[in-house]
Amino acid sequence: MLANKSVPASAPEHICHLTNPCLWNGKTSPKLYVVVAGLIVNGATEDQIVLPFGLRNLSMESNGSVLVNGLCVPEKDLIRTLESDPFVYDDMDEDGSFACVELKELCDIAADEEDCRNLLTEYVLQNAYHPSILCWKLPEDHADFAALLRELDSTRPVLF
């Protein structure tokens, strides 16, 4: 256990610092950490969430190459997937796979622009902790939502 801290429910956020964390590095080292957050009332746990996550540095070269912790991810290793159940990404996180999530179907089922915005927001926030997701991909006819995705998740590139 790296840390065990209690903070009041009124605290808007809590920051925990890790010293020399092991980076999630794809198949080489798919190291995951776990955050357990609970709501304790009068000493009894009323609600709890267990959230595995990985730490990694992600960047993109001017030629379009994706780098994880400074190493190029070969195009053949990047799995293009339509939006999936979070359990799919859990498995990818654990086995060190790399994903580019195509959001086309999510955009297609939206009733209107506001619905699309809401669906994209929910999906990105729900899956932003997965280190296996390296990028989001929007259909070209929904490129105007790129700014929203970048605002929600500034750590990943948005592709078209």
Can you annotate each of these PLM segments?
Residues 1-101, 114-160:
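Secreted/periplasmic carbohydrate-active enzymes, especially glycoside hydrolases
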